[in-house]
């Protein structure tokens, strides 16, 4: 983002252009500053978790509210791409978890699903209680991920070559896994190129 910002501002300063061209460059600068802000916020959150500045606070609360909080962050982006989003979650499922940070982790999975699902695609969110865990699954019919890359996607700053055109910095899945792992849970993925992806947050019942 920084190099793109420098290039855009240099062009604005040095090259004569029409008002329409100038407006396009300013929009581009805004996009890059948004990316920079996203990266900064993600790095701050990750650093605070890793250094213990932020301690997760698990309390028994309604998981439906946590899911709703995460969903609210992707509604506009999904509508913009005409992606249909369905949710199947019990309204009275009480679970010991950190609602704020679990919503952050779920939002990161949802955000990825929106980014890598083509316009007009589908995303489904489902919540199921098993004997030992509660599963929050985010499934899409997007690009999919090869089996050889499925472990790597949780590394910090990792991004697959074919998705570099999409916005992102490669830290969302890493942060999501950190949040869930610190609550005694884990994240699993089932995916194949061309067949979409299903990410499941598994949180312990006790």
Feature locations, PLM:
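Conserved micro-motifs of the catalytic ATP-binding
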Residues: 51-56, 94-98
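Conserved catalytic submotifs in the C-terminal HATPase_c
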Residues: 57-61, 79, 84-94
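Short beta-strand/loop element within the Bergerat-fold HATPase_c
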Residues: 120-132
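A conserved beta-strand-to-alpha-helix junction within the catalytic ATP-binding
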Residues: 57-72, 86, 128
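Short conserved segment of the HATPase_c
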Residues: 145-157
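Short alpha-helical segment of the dimerization/phosphotransfer core of two-component systems
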Residues: 31-36
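Conserved glycine-rich
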Residues: 185-186
